[in-house]
């Protein structure tokens, strides 16, 4: 449930009131349905939605990092699988995301990369309230 709340929170931060985004809404509903049935893939589904949100709103991450001055501080290749994970999220549909091997380091790198993009383009700082709630539950 916390991941679902986080999806709602980032959608709210990234969109303007009364500015319809039917494609984004469809992706949100689809990801929420998948999260309900694939609890073992919550991270990958969350990242997929972040990537889709960025792409649909015109901020598709440049994974090549060549000339990406706005994101030089974010290295998508900082772990063994992170670039492959990000490329899979960009190139696959929700129904075709492969089962990926995700290490702890991958989780940190991919999460930081996507969060960095979200914060850069949507100008929000601080942790998501839903993630802070999850941390408290898990501690």
What label would you give each PLM region?
Residues 1-139:
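Non-catalytic alpha-helical scaffolds and adjoining flexible linkers that form interface surfaces
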